[in-house]
Amino acid sequence: MTKIAYTGGGTVGHVSVNLSLIPTSIEKGHEAFYIGSKHGIEREMIESQLPDIQYYPISSGKLRRYLSFENAKDVFKVLKGILDARKILKKQKPDLLFSKGGFVSVPVVIAARSLKIPTIIHESDLTPGLANKISLKFAKKIYTTFEDTLTYLPKDKADFVGATVREDLKQGNKERGYQLTDFDKNKKVLLVMGGSLGSKKLNNIIRQNIEALLHDYQIIHLTGKGLVDDSINKKGYVQFEFVKDDLTDLLAITDTVVSRAGSNAIYEFLSLRIPMLLIPLGLDQSRGDQIDNAKNFESKGYGRHIPEDQLTEVNLLQELNDIELHRESIIKQMETYQESYTKEDLFDKIIHDALNK
């Protein structure tokens, strides 16, 4: 039996692979526990979705790419985080650490190295994030979701493993999806989702274009928390702040999606063969990882993308029309993609790579 420490947090994407792998490790007879921040989204997700897994909070600071007084304060938070993580790891004595990235992971990876605990890290985006760039110096291996990411990493440490897509994704119930929306089964469905926080600009453009869009589609609009507009009441248009348990049913009836370009989400659409129009987070809100993801997917023929600062009512409709025009060829391109590793295969690889010299 192997004991595995998991870490990663700050965004949903830095937790989702762990949420998939932890149950696999338990099913295979191993032990698992989680190290994350005190108040991050990872704590909420792990404690609500995996209540039997012990969660250990540590101090953590944010890794900023710009000069700020907060950077000086956060150095001390990171140092304390290393001490916190070292204390936990010393007591729990895991055989290995699996890190999904995010700023909370850095002190855990450094602490693991100080205790000679082998670490495997995972990068979901096309270009490695700052946390994983730092952690790579202390890790045994880094796994990538995009094959092209290998060009940014040392050959002896990097392996392409592809996306780990949750198994229930393809079990959505179409009948349930139509019941939830009261949609016509004979008209196409457009799913619009602006990420966990929503996108005010995307929401506004969808609403300004509502009549034109409803001519061709029925619309499921996931607006983000607090961004539902109750004044809009039109047949064929439904709004939710966000959807959790019923999302697979809504995806089952979706023909086209307009979405952010987070790695986990776009690989789920790819797995389901849903053509996508991607509106990545801009450089004013991120390091540009979603822009790279979106460009990569467009270059492979999986859909189209519009930078958020260039998004207009006109080009939204133009790109959706272009997707409809080329729908058959887009889906054919999607069908050429093959998932590399099941979560069971990935877990076995983690164990092998971490524990074999």
Curated annotation (Swiss-Prot):
It catalyses: Mur2Ac(oyl-L-Ala-gamma-D-Glu-L-Lys-D-Ala-D-Ala)-di-trans,octa-cis-undecaprenyl diphosphate + UDP-N-acetyl-alpha-D-glucosamine = beta-D-GlcNAc-(1->4)-Mur2Ac(oyl-L-Ala-gamma-D-Glu-L-Lys-D-Ala-D-Ala)-di-trans,octa-cis-undecaprenyl diphosphate + UDP + H(+). It is an enzyme of class 2 (transferase). Its main location: membrane. CDD domains: GT28_MurG. Keywords: Cell cycle, Cell division, Cell membrane, Cell shape, Cell wall biogenesis/degradation, Glycosyltransferase, Membrane, Peptidoglycan synthesis, Transferase. It is found in: Cell membrane. Gene3D superfamilies: Glycogen Phosphorylase B. GO terms for biological process: carbohydrate metabolic process; cell division; cell wall organization; lipid glycosylation; peptidoglycan biosynthetic process; regulation of cell shape. Pathway: Cell wall biogenesis; peptidoglycan biosynthesis. SUPFAM superfamilies: UDP-Glycosyltransferase/glycogen phosphorylase. The keyword Cell wall biogenesis/degradation applies. The keyword Nucleotide-binding does not apply. Its EC number is 2.4.1.227. One of its GO terms (cellular component) is plasma membrane. UDP-N-acetyl-alpha-D-glucosamine binds at R166, S196, Q290. It is a peripheral membrane protein. Pfam families: Glyco_tran_28_C (PF04101), Glyco_transf_28 (PF03033). Transmembrane segments: none annotated. InterPro entries: GlcNAc_MurG, Glyco_trans_28_C, GlycoTrans_28_N. One of its GO terms (molecular function) is undecaprenyldiphospho-muramoylpentapeptide beta-N-acetylglucosaminyltransferase activity. Cell wall formation. Catalyzes the transfer of a GlcNAc subunit on undecaprenyl-pyrophosphoryl-MurNAc-pentapeptide (lipid intermediate I) to form undecaprenyl-pyrophosphoryl-MurNAc-(pentapeptide)GlcNAc (lipid intermediate II). HAMAP family: MurG (MF_00033). Belongs to the glycosyltransferase 28 family. MurG subfamily. NCBIfam families: PRK12446.1. This is UDP-N-acetylglucosamine--N-acetylmuramyl-(pentapeptide) pyrophosphoryl-undecaprenol N-acetylglucosamine transferase. It comes from Staphylococcus epidermidis (strain ATCC 35984 / DSM 28319 / BCRC 17069 / CCUG 31568 / BM 3577 / RP62A).
